[in-house]
């Protein structure tokens, strides 16, 4: 499901994620946020239009462990700006 993260600067956070994965990506599109595809997995990261949130969707080709690994990896990159702060914690609940 979709995972929301509170971020101060959605555009910069998307750019940071893109820089991290760009060399390994098979394709990159920016039609609805940032979508990157790899051999066994892909993700879409898009900004909310109404809140300071990024919404993350990660998919794999049936590899549950890879799904968990890549989701955790992406969330560490996305939420990096909040790692030293106690206020404005990232939201880890799925979107309704």
Where are the predicted features?
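Phosphate-binding and adjacent anionic-ligand microenvironments
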Residues: 1-57, 62-96
